[in-house]
Each structure stands twice: as C-alpha cells, then as structure tokens.
Amino acid sequence: MHSKVVIIGSGPAAHTAAIYLARAELKPVLYEGFMANGIAAGGQLTTTTEIENFPGFPDGIMGQELMDKMKAQSERFGTQIISETVAKVDLSARPFKYATEWSPEEYHTADSIILATGASARRLHLPGEEKYWQNGISACAVCDGAVPIFRNKHLVVIGGGDSAAEEAMYLTKYGSHVTVLVRKDKLRASSIMAHRLLNHEKVTVRFNTVGVEVKGDDKGLMSHLVVKDVTTGKEETLEANGLFYAIGHDPATALVKGQLETDADGYVVTKPGTTLTSVEGVFAAGDVQDKRYRQAITSAGTGCMAALDAEKFLSEHEETPAEHRDTSAVQGNL
C-alpha cells in the first residue's frame, strides 16, 4: 500500500493532523496502534480524568470522550484508521518504508510521515514491581482505579506534579484513603491542584519520601509498600493494596532511533516554529517533540502545524519522482 501521508499515533496531535489532511483531500492513513507503548488508542488522554482546560467544553469533558470525538471527526472527513502498531520505518529514502507489528516483513510506502507517537509513563522498577504489576501496581488510575482490588483500600500514588495530584484525587472515589509520596519537600503541581490535594480529607501527602519495595500476599496481590524518608533514611512498611505511578513520561521515539535527530532526553528535535525534523518529509507533533508544555491543546496545535507542513511539502514535491529522492543528505541539517 502506498499513501501520500501516513500518521503514526492516536492522540490529539495525530487526529488533528488527520482532520486537516483529510479535508485537504490527501487521504491520510492513521495507524493508531494496538496498545502501542502500552497505551490504548487515544494516547495519554485516555488515562486522565475530567479535562477542564480544553476550549469548547465549559463543563469539562472526560479524556476518553474527547479522544472518541476527535477520532469520529477525523473519520468523518475520510481518514483511514488502522488499529495496528507500526513496528519499523526506513527513512533513508523516499518513498519512506514502514511495516506493522503483525506483518513485519510486508513493507508499505509513504511520501511523507507525521510522527505523533507521544510519550509513555515512567516506572520505578522497584523490587516486587514486576511480580505485582497489574496485580496492585499501575501507571493509570483512570484505567484501573475502579477495579475491585482497589475499592475501599489504602492506595498510594508516587509523584509530585499535576498528574500525581489528578490521579490521587480520582482514586479518592474508590479507595478508603490515598497517600501521595513526594520525593522532595514540596509539590510541583499547579497551585490549584496542590490546594485541592492538600485539603482533601481522604488524602495524605508525605514529603521527602520514596518507595523502596513492593510486597504481596499469598493471593499474588500487592499488600504492602516499604517506604523511606530520604532525610533520615528511616524505612517504614505501609499497608497498601494499590500503587500508582505518576512520575513523568518518556517520548516514544524507539521507532526512529538513529534516523531522526533527538535531544538528550530522547525527544524529536524540530526546526523552531515548525514540525520539520532532520529528515525532509518527516514531521513530528505532540508530546514526542514537546517536553515543555505537554498539554492536549498544544498537542492538537502541533498536529495542525504538521498537517500544514506536510501539505506544503507534498505540493512542492509532487513533480519529483519519489523513488529517486535520497533523504540521507538532509539529516541533521535543521
């Protein structure tokens, strides 16, 4: 299969790009992935609670609902959405080549690619984490918080930013109490989120505290968490039936490692004010190239930019035989 433009991703950036490209009659193909990077189609927004700061929704909207609406809108204009994960790409020459996880030896081609793969939640890899992962440990409170093993139990959230505050607030609906562990002596969360968290009757925030080890019961479920005060070195074992990580994200750039220029943290480098990457014809949008803002609205904005950049690129190169275009010479020249 050959396409003028392929979008890899399923979040606000990917679907906004798809909407613009489909309306421009460029017939975009969007690979939303099948649990790509361990995240369901829709990206990080599917793991959040109510979104209060996305324009157009004065009463707020749930993350999953917002992504469902974006997907429906991109499909309405003709975007072809494929629920497969792109496993490898070859950006050395145009048309670019790529293959999916389910058919790794069957290559497809595209004149341009928009990378909107987002970022994935970090894990601490504590002793016992692998054993009790999804048996008490999660990186998504919205996905897992309502399951029976967490109801009316003491739950722990690790992190000090807005995500941690949001996850903890969400978990108060189900847990008997929520303890938030913050490595430093203050929260990084915004003032409004910090105020809500610190004043919630079902939340306790423990500063200068880290997780050390996860322990479980004879049923194979998490039952305790060993924590340590980093100022005194004193350890304590907490009874806890749930542990939720909210400690940041890593950009999903393994797919293009060694082919696109990335920064020290692994984020794709784009030319300032654009979504152009180090390879002509490849564009990056959303959290995969944004480590500063990481908001749904900014992701959508860069998705729009990527679509317009791709449309301009395609119009300028439609007369050039794609099979003779070697992209290696332009790599790294931002």
From Swiss-Prot:
Molecular function as annotated in GO: thioredoxin-disulfide reductase (NADPH) activity
Name of the protein: Thioredoxin reductase
GO CC, any one term: cytosol
Keyword NADP: yes
Pfam families: Pyr_redox_2
SUPFAM superfamilies found in the cross-reference section: FAD/NAD(P)-binding domain (SSF51905)
Organism encoding this protein: Neurospora crassa (strain ATCC 24698 / 74-OR23-1A / CBS 708.71 / DSM 1257 / FGSC 987)
Family named by the database record: Belongs to the class-II pyridine nucleotide-disulfide oxidoreductase family.
Subcellular location: Cytoplasm
Cofactor detail note: Binds 1 FAD per subunit.
GO terms, biological process: cell redox homeostasis; removal of superoxide radicals
Reactions catalysed: [thioredoxin]-dithiol + NADP(+) = [thioredoxin]-disulfide + NADPH + H(+)
Cofactor(s) needed: FAD
Complexes and interactors: Homodimer.
Binding site residues for FAD: S10, G11, P12, A13, I39, A40, Q44, N53, V86, C143, D287, R294, Q295, A296
InterPro entries the record matches: FAD/NAD-bd_sf (IPR036188), FAD/NAD-binding_dom (IPR023753), Ferredoxin-NADP_redctase_2 (IPR050097), Pyr_nucl-diS_OxRdtase_2_AS (IPR008255), Thioredox_Rdtase (IPR005982)
